[in-house]
C-alpha cells in the first residue's frame, strides 16, 4: 500500500513544478503571493487526504487532518524517508525559482493586533477606574485614621488616595481587568458605584474642616457612618459618646445598598419636622438623651422621618460629659423615661400621669433589653434591639 502511495506522491510533485513555474511566470500580483515549499508531511498527506475524503465524504477537513497527523506520527523513519527526500528536492527547486524569497507571515500580525486591542481596552478600563477613585478620594485624605470596624474600607480607601490610584484598583475588586464573567461584571459595577459614593461622602465630610458639622452630610450617605465615626469622636468632641451611635437606627441590617435606600427614602420627609425637633433638642442637655429620644420616637411612631430630622438638626457642639467613655457607657434610664414620655402621642409632657406610667413601663422593658445584651458596641447592637419591642405601645 505504501509503495502505491509513494508512486502517486512521487509522480504528483513532478507535475507540480510546471504549475509553480507557470504561476511564477504569470503577472506580478501572483508573484507577490508565493507559497512555501511543501514539507515531508504535506507531500505524504496530500494524496492521503484526497483518498480519505473520497472514502468518507461527510468527514470534516479538520478531522481528516487530525487522523493524518496521528498516522504520520506512528510511521517509522524508513517509511518517511522517501517523502523527506521529495520535500528536500522541492525546497531546492523552490529556491532556484525564487532566489530572493523571504517568508513573511501575514496572519501572525493580525493575531498580535487582536491581542493588543484587548489588552489596550483592559488597560484603559483599569486606568479609568483607578483614576476615578483617586480623584474622588484625594481631597478627603484617603480615610486617614479610620479603625476598628472599618478596617477593610480603610484599606480600600487608602490605596487609591495615597497616590497608587491606577495600580491598586484591581486588588480592590479582586478581579483582573477585562476578566469579569457576565454576572460578576454587574456586581463589580455596583461595587464600583458604591465605593465612588463612599469616596464622595468622605470628601464632603472632610472638606468643611469642622468635625461638628459632619452630621449634616450623613442622611445622604448613611452607609458610611460605622466606618467614619471612630476618627471623628476623638478630634472634635471626645467626651460625648452618643453622636457615634445616633445614626445606626436606619442601618438595622448593614447591607450597603438596601440600608442606604431605606434611609434616603426617609430622610427627605424629615425636613418638615426640622424646626420642632431642633427646638426640642436644644432644651435637652445630654447627647445620650437625644439619641434615646431618636430611638424611642422611631420605634413608637413607626416612621423614620423624625429620626432623620433629629440627625439632620444635631447641634454642632455638645456639652462635655464627665467621665464618659466612647463605647462602653451604660444607658441612662432616667433620660430614656423623660424622652419617651415627651414623644408619646397621648400627652407629650412629663407631668402627665398616664404618659409617665406608659413611659415607666417602656423604660423598664428597654433597660431590661439593654442590660441583657453585650455592652461592647451599644450603638449598633443594643440601640436597635432595645427599641424594637416598643412598637406595641
From Swiss-Prot:
Region of interest (Disordered), residue spans: 1-34, 197-247, 315-334, 374-393
Subcellular location: Nucleus
Pfam families from the UniProt entry: HMG_box, SOXp
Biased segments, Basic residues type: 213-234
Coiled coil (UniProt feature): none
GO cellular component: nucleus
Compositional bias (Polar residues): 375-393
Record protein name field: Transcription factor Sox-1
Gene that this sequence comes from: sox1
Amino acid at each position: 500500500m505504501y509503495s502505491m502511495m509513494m508512486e502517486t506522491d512521487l509522480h504528483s510533485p513532478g507535475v507540480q513544478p510546471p504549475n509553480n513555474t507557470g504561476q511564477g511566470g504569470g503577472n506580478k500580483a501572483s508573484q507577490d503571493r508565493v507559497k512555501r515549499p511543501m514539507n515531508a508531511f504535506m507531500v505524504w498527506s496530500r494524496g492521503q487526504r484526497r483518498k480519505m475524503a473520497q472514502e468518507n465524504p461527510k468527514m470534516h477537513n479538520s478531522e481528516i487532518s487530525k487522523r493524518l497527523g496521528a498516522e504520520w506520527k506512528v510511521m517509522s523513519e524508513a517509511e518517511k524517508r522517501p517523502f523527506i527526500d521529495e520535500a528536500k528536492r522541492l525546497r531546492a527547486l523552490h529556491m532556484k525559482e525564487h532566489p530572493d524569497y523571504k517568508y513573511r507571515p501575514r496572519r501572525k500580525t493580525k493575531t498580535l493586533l487582536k491581542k493588543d486591542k484587548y489588552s489596550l481596552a483592559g488597560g484603559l478600563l483599569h486606568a479609568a477606574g483607578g483614576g476615578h477613585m483617586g480623584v474622588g478620594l484625594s481631597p478627603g485624605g484617603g480615610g486617614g485614621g479610620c479603625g476598628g470596624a472599618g478596617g477593610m474600607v480603610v484599606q480600600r480607601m487608602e490605596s487609591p488616595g495615597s497616590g497608587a490610584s491606577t495600580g491598586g484598583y484591581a486588588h480592590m475588586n479582586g478581579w483582573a481587568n477585562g476578566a469579569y464573567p457576565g454576572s460578576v461584571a454587574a456586581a463589580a459595577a455596583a461595587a464600583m458605584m458604591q465605593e465612588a459614593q463612599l469616596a464622595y461622602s468622605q470628601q464632603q465630610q472632610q472638606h468643611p474642616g469642622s468635625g461638628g458639622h459632619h452630621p449634616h452630610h450623613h442622611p445622604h450617605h448613611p452607609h458610611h457612618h460605622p466606618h467614619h465615626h471612630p476618627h471623628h469622636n476623638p478630634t472634635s468632641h471626645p467626651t460625648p459618646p452618643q453622636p457615634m451611635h445616633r445614626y445606626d437606627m436606619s442601618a438595622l441590617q448593614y447591607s450597603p445598598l438596601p440600608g442606604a435606600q431605606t434611609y434616603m427614602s426617609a430622610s427627605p420627609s424629615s425636613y418638615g419636622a426640622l424646626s420642632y425637633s431642633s427646638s426640642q433638642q436644644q432644651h435637652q442637655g445630654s447627647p445620650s438623651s437625644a439619641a434615646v429620644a431618636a430611638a424611642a420616637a422611631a420605634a413608637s411612631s413607626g416612621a423614620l422621618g423624625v429620626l432623620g430630622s433629629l440627625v439632620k438638626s444635631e447641634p454642632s457642639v455638645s456639652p462635655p460629659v464627665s467621665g464618659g467613655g466612647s463605647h462602653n457607657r451604660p444607658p441612662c434610664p432616667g433620660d430614656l423615661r423623660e424622652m419617651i414620655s415627651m414623644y408619646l402621642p397621648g400627652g407629650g409632657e412629663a407631668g402627665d400621669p398616664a404618659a409617665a406610667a406608659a413611659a415607666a413601663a417602656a423604660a423598664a422593658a428597654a433597660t431590661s433589653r439593654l442590660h441583657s445584651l453585650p455592652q461592647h458596641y451599644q450603638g449598633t447592637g443594643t440601640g436597635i434591639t432595645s427599641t424594637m419591642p416598643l412598637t406595641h405601645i
